[in-house]
Swiss-Prot record:
Record family assignment: Belongs to the IAP family.
Inducing factors: Constitutively expressed. Up-regulated by bacterial lipopolysaccharides (LPS) in Malpighian tubules but not in salivary glands.
Subcellular location: Nucleus; Cytoplasm
An example Gene Ontology CC term for this record: nucleus
UniProt note: phenotype after gene disruption: Normal development and viability. Acute sensitivity to infection by Gram-negative bacteria with failure to induce expression of antibacterial peptide genes and inability to mount a proper innate immune response. Loss of cleavage and nuclear translocation of Rel. Increased activity of the effector caspase Drice and increased apoptosis following x-ray irradiation. Reduced ion channel expression in Malpighian tubules.
Alphabetical keyword list: Apoptosis, Cytoplasm, Immunity, Innate immunity, Metal-binding, Nucleus, Repeat, Zinc, Zinc-finger
Protein's UniProt name: Death-associated inhibitor of apoptosis 2
Gene: Diap2
């Protein structure tokens, strides 16, 4: 959903007409962080990175959830330069054009190097080239030789001969997101990332089913094994919900049912949930595009599967099980979250108070005794970078959000992908070491290519920014930290060993 005008906060706010007043997060907070309502219950989508979030809980900070779900979104990295138009900047007269405030940049595309370079038209300092400064994330302020970073708002002046723009940027502002991306990579929007083959990370909605074996165990009483084998469904990211032939994706939470013998699980999954990150990682964007093209060509045919129906938690909060739980002193947010989980997992409501309480206790890891749980602690908000002006003669580093840890550079990780695969291939054809038996050599070569999580499939995903090739396509979505170095995973690149 990328309708024209969604860069305007007022347009995005209009999509929240049916947003519940007692929702865990307010429509205003969502709009201010780039989201619009999709119309699918509590689901909201970011206009700038297209990440979707629907499992909101009381105490959530929208900016923090957005940063965790899509750390390279332009709205997260540079909200003042991503093209977002706050309501305060819109004209009071309907139909008039939007006027930028003095603090905002007249060109909302300064995240692009070419547009930054244009600002150096009258650059006065011959000690360093405009190309080097633009590459390092700076644009010219038209004042002496002062340049400003689009990402961290840091300002540097008094450039000297032989200065390296990126190294100076790194020295004064080491936590700047542009610095952490590395000198060789230019900022890319979601579309550019797709073209580069980089897939941002999103957390699975049902992480306990991220493992294929865990999904397979749910099919113990699968009723139509003669029509659809459980193994094929589990490989496609689906687990059984113990209701008819209804299955659900562990990652995107799409529900599918009414299976026919000719149905292919991967095809149906991609057809009904083309933005599912698990499908995109396991099968690739080309496969999803092919499925959508085939579906469009056969639009007149009857769909083989249909999304599972859902109910609204608002209505169920007035039912007996919810009212009885509230009467026991259990927090309303806890009850609502339990009901929402039940709807997402099964499409039906709790029939008794006991069933509701069991779900609450299971989720909290509590025992059988009734406990009144405290509301969840609010997440720490993401601290906006502060602006600082730095002269190279006497510099003061800029404070940047503590929540952005220093990581290996993404550019180096991307550049190392081919190097990693080449090394593995060389290992496969290397002359056996005289100190090792042929059997031991073969074992080591095989281990080097095995997924470090399931120890079964061949590795096929490179983690960014660390650059490790450690898991297969199936296991990659289930890990938040690299199994090799424990670094946070910000993105994936599908890799093929030939």
């Amino acid at each position: 959903m990328t309708e024209l005008g969604m860069e305007l906060e007022s347009v995005r706010l209009a999509t929240f007409g049916e947003w519940p007043l007692n929702a865990p997060v307010s429509a205003e907070d969502l709009v201010a962080n780039g989201f619009f309502a999709t119309g699918n219950w509590l689901e909201a989508e970011c206009h700038f990175c297209h990440v979707r979030i629907d499992r909101w809980e009381y105490g959530d900070q929208v900016a923090e959830r957005h940063r965790r779900s899509s750390p390279i979104c332009s709205m997260v990295l540079a909200p003042n330069h991503c093209g977002n138009v706050p309501r305060s900047q819109e004209s009071d007269n309907e139909g008039n054009s939007v006027v930028d405030s003095p603090e905002s940049c007249s060109c909302p595309d300064l995240l692009l190097e070419a547009n930054r370079l244009v600002t150096f038209k009258d650059w006065p300092n011959p000690n360093i080239t405009p190309q080097a400064l633009a590459k390092a994330g700076f644009y010219y302020l038209n004042r002496l030789d002062h340049v400003k970073c689009v990402w961290c708002n840091g300002v540097i002046a008094k450039w000297e001969k032989n200065d390296n723009a990126f190294e100076e940027h790194k020295r004064f502002f080491p936590q700047c997101p542009r610095v952490q991306m590395g000198p060789l990579i230019e900022f890319a929007t979601g579309k550019n990332l797709d073209e580069l083959g980089i897939q941002p990370t999103t957390l699975p909605l049902r992480p306990k089913y991220a493992c294929v074996d865990a999904r397979l165990r749910t099919f113990t009483d699968w009723p139509i094994s003669n029509i659809q084998p459980a193994s094929a469904l589990a490989q496609a990211g689906l687990y059984y919900q113990k209701i008819g032939d209804q299955v659900r994706c562990f990652h995107c939470n799409i529900g599918l049912r009414s299976w026919q013998k000719e149905d292919e699980p991967w095809f149906e999954h991609a057809k009904w949930s083309p933005k599912c990150q698990f499908v995109l990682l396991a099968k690739g964007p080309a496969y999803v595009s092919e499925v959508l093209a085939t579906t469009a060509a056969n639009a007149s045919s009857q769909p083989a599967t249909a999304p599972a129906p859902t109910l609204q938690a608002d209505v169920l909060m007035d039912e007996a099980p919810a009212k009885e739980a509230l009467a026991l002193g259990i927090d309303g947010g806890v009850v609502r979250n339990a009901i929402q989980r039940k709807l997402l997992s099964s499409g039906c409501a709790f029939s008794t108070l006991d069933e509701l309480l069991h779900d609450i206790f299971d989720d909290a890891g509590a025992g059988a005794a009734l406990e009144v749980r405290e509301p969840p602690e609010p997440s720490a908000p993401f601290i906006e970078p502060c602006q600082a002006t730095t002269s190279k003669a006497a510099s003061v580093p800029i404070p940047v959000a503590d929540s952005i840890p220093a990581k290996p550079q993404a550019a180096e990780a991307v550049a190392n992908i081919s190097k990693i695969t080449d090394e593995i291939q060389k290992m496969s054809v290397a002359t056996p070491n005289g100190n090792l038996s042929l059997e031991e050599e073969n074992r080591q070569l095989k281990d080097a290519r095995l997924c470090k999580v399931c120890l079964d499939e061949e590795v096929g995903v490179v983690f960014l920014p660390c650059g490790h090739l450690a898991t297969c396509n199936q296991c990659a979505p289930s890990v938040a930290n690299c199994p090799m170095c424990r670094a946070d995973i910000k993105g994936f690149v599908r890799t093929f060993l030939s």
